[in-house]
Amino acid sequence: MKLKGTRTEKNLLAAFAGESQARNRYTYFASAAKKEGFEQIAAIFMETADNEKEHAKRFFKFLEGGMAEFTASFPAGRIGTTAENLKAAAEGEHEEWSKLYPGFADIAQEEGFLDVAAAFRYISKVEIEHEKRYLKLLENVANGRVFKKEKSATWICRNCGYHHEGPEVPEQCPTCLHPKSFFELWAENY
C-alpha cells in the first residue's frame, strides 16, 4: 500500500516536525534549567529530548521520500524560567497524547496503515509519562521541593556520587565541593 499522498503521510510529516521541534526546545530548556541551578531537571530535559529524537526517527522511517506539502501549526514559544518551560513542555506532551496522536492513529488505521497506527499509539503512551514527569517536576519547583523534602531522604551528588541522608541537600557536596544544584534523590533502579 502506498503512503504517498495520503492523510497518514501528512500526519507523519507533522508528527516528525513536531517531535523534532520538541527535541530542540527541550535542549534549550535544559540550558535554562542548568543556569537556574537545576542539574537534574536539565538532565531530564536532555533525556526527553533524546526520546523525542527517537520518536521523530520512527515517524521519519515510515515516509517514502519525495516532497509533500501540508499545513500545520507549531508552538512559537520562548525560553522562559524552568517553571515556565516545564509547564510548556507538559502542555505540549498533553496535546500529543490526548489529541494529535490518537487522531493520527485512527486515520492511519482507516487508511490501512496498521503499523503506523500502532506507532502513534505506543508513542502516545510515552508522551503520557513525559507529561506526568514534567508536572511533578513543576510541582517540586513551585513548592521549593527540588532540594528539600518533608521527610529524610537519600540524595546523590550527580558529579561524584556522594550520598547524603537528610530532608534537604547540603549547600555544597562535602566530597567534590560542587554546589547543591548537583544533588538529586537517589533511586536504586538496578
Task: Report residues per predicted region.
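Non-heme di-metal
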Residues: 1-190
